[in-house]
Each structure stands twice: as C-alpha cells, then as structure tokens.
C-alpha cells in the first residue's frame, strides 16, 4: 500500500509529537509508532525538564551540562539547549502543560544531580506522562496530523543518499510512505538490555536503519545507567525508576549496613559506579534509598507515582527504605545530526534519543532529555517549514514482499545486537538474546 505525505515522523514521544506541532498547519504530517502512541520513554519520564532560569543562568547551565558530560559535549549544541530552553517551556505551558507551582503561582523548581541550582520544572513525579498527554491532546486537534499505531518501520526509502520516506509493516501488510522530509524520533536502545527502565519495544530500530544505509552515527558507546531503579527480582519487565528528584529533595543512599557512601547529587555515572562498588563490597544486589525522614504527606504529594507503585509491590516508602540498583536508562550516542537535526542523508532528520546532537557528552545531565527533545525537534520542524516547498516527492516503488520485510527486520535486530555486543565487550551478557 502506497501512502503520500509531506512529512513522515517515526515515533510519538516528545520529539515526534513536538516536531509535528511545530510544523506549519498546511503541511500534511503522518506519524508512525511501533506500538501504542503512549508506549514511549517520554511517558515514563519522572523527574522533570531542565531550563535556564534566566539569561544569567545560561552560562552556569552550560557549565553544569559540560561537566556532567565529562567535557565531551559539543559546546555550541549545549549553548543552543540553554538559550532556547525557556521559550520551549513557555510553548508547553501555552499548550496546557501543568507544572507544579508555589503558593504564589510561580513555577516550583527542583534540583537533581550535578545541577548547581534548582532549575528543573516538574509535574509531581510523572512529568513525562503529563508532557505526553499535553502534546498528544494538541496533536489530536490538528487535522493535518495523522497517527498510525502498531506499525513497525523497518527500512528507509532512499536513492543517492536522499531519503524519500520509509517502509513499514502492519498486520502482515507492507506500507510504503513517500514523503518530502522524514523525521526519525524512534527512541533509544533499552529494549536490547535485560535490565532497563525503557519500554521493551525500544530496540534501536533507528540506529539499525542508519547503520544499514551508511548514515553517520556517533558515540554509540555512550550508554547511561541510572543509579536508582527499584530492585525487584520478581519481574523481567522494564525496571521501575526511582527518580533522581527523590535524591534532589533530600533522599539518602545507604549501604545495606545503613552507612552513607556517596554524595547523592554527583553526576549519574559517578553515583552508579559508587553503587556498583558498594554492592560488590557487601556482596549485595542493591543498596538503599532512604526518604523515611521526610514528612509522609510530602512524599505522597510530591512522589505519588513512585509511592503508589512501590506500595503495589508491598513497600511503603514513607516507612521503609527503598532497595535500588543501577540499570540501563539512556543512550547519549546516536545518529549524528547538525544544529537543525539534519542527518548525513538529505531530507532525513533525527530528534530525541535516537539522535546525537552532542548535547550530553559522555553522561547526560539529569532532566536534559525532554528538553533536548523539545529544542532540537522544533529546530528540525522550522528547517522543514523553510525548505519543504523546494523539495519534490519521489514515489519510488520498493516492491517488497512480506518475506523481504521479515528478513530486513531480522537483519536490523542482528545488526544492533552485534554492534552493541562489540561495544559492551565483557558486559555483553547484559543484552537480551537474539
């Protein structure tokens, strides 16, 4: 089945939804998602969104991001992130986003690891869910935007290093989407790992297609492990994250001997490594995160999602310490893009976790992921707004069979598993089996 559209967006997380909303209303947009629209990492994000408080805070925000990233970031990208943060937060608010506020009506800012000041806006401990719902509801109002769920994109349509759309599979039917511009916003790699906070459907499909088409990628070894996922030996599903904002509000990390062993607000990689060492020293599979000294009413109001989830597993976090351990959480590497999110293939953009803007360096600063998705997806959309009238659609017929599609899907899977096995080396057993 052949479908013509102006802009094809692969993914329905913050980067996909926000790019769609940032395109002009006379542009026909088709969005594809592998499962349900809400089954994205954005929906799971807890802590919040970083933002420069004002012009004066921008240099400090840049410095914090560079320091957390071990100075392997692209500084100009970080400057863009800081400079354009507030305007995108304001746009979210105009769409109806409800951030937590102080009694005087001002935004309530919290602090997380490696931030010098409180600069993170949030919606209790379910910021990502509220961001998703805000953007998704706005998208549903736009007659120029169509979302197709439960469809697996398995290949890009290209010729002479120019992208003309993508091929996808739904209910054993092959769909060929011809577009003037294509945005890859397909998310990260957590579904490749046995233990991850990510949705299980996020299996590096965008990275696989980029590798198969010789599209430039960067820093594929930059994989972040979040220090504090709930330790639960009874489930093989995605691991439940205990937000960094819990430590930002005063939560303490303790060994199983109830001793503090690390500054809780150091960068994530530092805290995760400290926990690994403590677990090895004590021959334990977890350490404790303790918030029992906090007021119970504050805990249930500030962290309602975490409280309810832990309680459903028999753990009252107002009275008991939380067993936590590091698990795979975020992918800082990805498809190499310029400052407008353009890849090395013409008319193909990449935004969000699948992309490498250079913002994060070797270790992402807490709560910069949703912000990156906002800032650089808007830049992609604005670039398309200015260029789309000069682009002609190429309706190249792929003539793929179901057998071809299934073979390519298997090939994509093998490519990324083999790639990340070579990257992880001795830790390759953390990946799922092919």
From Swiss-Prot:
Please give the InterPro entries that the UniProt record associates with this protein: FAD-dep_OxRdtase_2_FAD-bd (IPR003953), FAD/NAD-bd_sf (IPR036188), NadB (IPR005288), Succ_DH/fumarate_Rdtase_cat_sf (IPR027477)
Biological-process GO terms, alphabetical: 'de novo' NAD biosynthetic process from L-aspartate
Q: Which reaction does it catalyse?
A: L-aspartate + O2 = iminosuccinate + H2O2
- Name the pathway it acts in: Cofactor biosynthesis; NAD(+) biosynthesis; iminoaspartate from L-aspartate (oxidase route): step 1/1
The subcellular localization recorded is:
Cytoplasm
Report the domain of life of the source organism. Answer: Bacteria
EC code: 1.4.3.16
Residue numbers annotated as active site: 268
Key words of the record: Cytoplasm, FAD, Flavoprotein, Nucleotide-binding, Oxidoreductase, Pyridine nucleotide biosynthesis
Recorded GO cellular component terms are: cytoplasm
Q: Which GO terms describe its molecular function?
A: L-aspartate oxidase activity; nucleotide binding; steroid dehydrogenase activity, acting on the CH-CH group of donors
Major location (coarse): cytoplasm
Per the UniProt record, the site (Important in orienting the L-aspartate substrate) maps to: 112
Tell me the cofactor note: Binds 1 FAD per subunit.
Enzymatic class? oxidoreductase
Write one Pfam family the protein is assigned to: FAD_binding_2
Q: Does the keyword Cytoplasm apply?
A: yes
Q: Where does FAD bind?
A: 12-15, 34, 41-48, 205, 353, 369-370
Matches recorded under NCBIfam families: PRK06175.1
Describe its function: Catalyzes the oxidation of L-aspartate to iminoaspartate, the first step in the de novo biosynthesis of NAD(+).
Say which family it is in.
Answer: Belongs to the FAD-dependent oxidoreductase 2 family. NadB subfamily.
In Swiss-Prot or TrEMBL terms, this protein is called L-aspartate oxidase
Name its species: Clostridium acetobutylicum (strain ATCC 824 / DSM 792 / JCM 1419 / IAM 19013 / LMG 5710 / NBRC 13948 / NRRL B-527 / VKM B-1787 / 2291 / W)
